[in-house]
Amino acid sequence: MSIDINWEAATSGPDGEKLAERIRSFIHDKFQQIALPRFIRSVEVNSFDFGTVSPELQVRDICDPFNDFYEEDEDGEDLSESSVSDEPAPSSQGLSQSTPNGDAGSSNSSSNGDGGGNTNSRVGYFQRRYPSGEYAGDFPQPLMSPINLGESFNPYLFPRAGTPGIPGGTSNLGYYNMPRGGLSGTQTPLASVASVARGGPLSLAEGWPPPARQRERARSSDADVDSPQSRSRPSTSSTRQRTSTDGGTPHDSAEIPESESVITGHLDSALPTRRMREQKPDDFQVLCRLQYSGNMRLSITAQILLDYPMPSFVGLPLKLNITGFTFDGVAVVAYIRKRIHVCFLSPEDADTLLGADDKMASTEGYHDHHNHHHSGNTNTTGSRRSNDSLLREIRVESEIGRKESGKQVLKNVGKVEKFVLEQVRRIFEEEFVYPSFWTFLV
């Protein structure tokens, strides 16, 4: 079943301009968090344009939502049923960032970023989740301004929906990101539960067992304690459990080495407790194939440093017009009690869940006759590889400095073009491809 989208009505007018500006601001903020190479001083995202070509949507399956969408926040800030009621919320927007121990820091602003206070918008937040306590390192800086897409969508995007953009009402954005842990092939969380794809709610994170089972396995595992995968995969060692006859604990502490007890205690304190929402019969999830090949455009300006006659002698502006986006992937849209969860599946996970589809094979690389640098995959087999990207092709048109006699002063900008294209692809895959997913309150 295909879905028709009135692309012009959805992306034009004041609402379309606001949405385009918020997307531009979001991508710009992500570029500010990237470590730039030595030959680039700065990167600025100037504009974003939806273009005139609409994507194609085809519903592939309707099933129960993934179990991951039922998980509540560890820090207790998850909105309850009463908090997502129809009562208007304060106009200020909050921004919070959780820590591995569940602590959160927040900062509030008195306006919604565009100068006008929206008294009907709910609090938007940015959050990262780290399953099984595998987090190590510093958190990235939070976004400068949370994106409230609910104000920008309009009913033309999904004509049959009763609300702007998605069913329900004014929506606001929450972001969840869960690292993949380097799994691929049959080790991916989705592949491990593909056998029960039609038997009930799925969890793309079933590769991590519940904390209770992990604690039991940690006590009985002697070989996998120091392995990075020991916290995320089941232990293969046997479980030895003694039954106490004098009313004591089932385990004899004398038989547990002191070093193992210390490690076990560390694992117990590091593993978060997954609190799940109650599943209801009216919860549902839609898997749809999304194809796009149009004239969407992203304009970026990069400052290139010249090292002659001395290091960092001068900076030249390089204008990059990124266009030629070609996208083909499977989108997941789950509706769970006034929440819309949206993400994309990696090509490998999509083939595991829906089966390999010859129609979804990668298209051949675009043959550009204007010497434009482009990025595309050339895999033409029916089953896509795990390293295939959902963004099949991206092209960039570069313009540096001033022009003389219709020719550019400098043309050797291949390194900058390659870097920018790689970052655009990485931002998309890290922010929209599972295990990352976006939550809209409706």
UniProtKB/Swiss-Prot annotation:
Membrane-topology descriptor: Peripheral membrane protein
Domain notes for this protein: The SMP-LTD domain is a barrel-like domain that can bind various types of glycerophospholipids in its interior and mediate their transfer between two adjacent bilayers.
Annotated Low complexity bias: 101-112, 227-245
Keywords of this entry: Endoplasmic reticulum, Lipid transport, Lipid-binding, Membrane, Mitochondrion, Mitochondrion outer membrane, Transport
Gene coding for it: MDM12
Biased composition (Basic and acidic residues): 213-222
Name the record gives this protein: Mitochondrial distribution and morphology protein 12
Record's compositionally biased regions (Polar residues): 90-100
Alphabetized PANTHER family for the sequence: MITOCHONDRIAL DISTRIBUTION AND MORPHOLOGY PROTEIN 12
InterPro entries listed in its UniProt record: Mdm12 (IPR027532), MMM1_dom (IPR019411), SMP_LBD (IPR031468)
Entry GO CC: endoplasmic reticulum membrane; ERMES complex
Source lineage: Eukaryota, Fungi, Dikarya, Ascomycota, Pezizomycotina
Protein transport is among the record's keywords: no
Subunit structure: Component of the ER-mitochondria encounter structure (ERMES) or MDM complex, composed of MMM1, MDM10, MDM12 and MDM34. A MMM1 homodimer associates with one molecule of MDM12 on each side in a pairwise head-to-tail manner, and the SMP-LTD domains of MMM1 and MDM12 generate a continuous hydrophobic tunnel for phospholipid trafficking.
Subcellular location, record wording: Mitochondrion outer membrane; Endoplasmic reticulum membrane
Start and end residues of each stretch annotated as Disordered: 67-125, 202-277, 364-387
Any one GO molecular function term: lipid binding
GO process terms (BP): mitochondrial genome maintenance; mitochondrion-endoplasmic reticulum membrane tethering; phospholipid transport; protein insertion into mitochondrial outer membrane
Positions of the SMP-LTD domain: 1-442
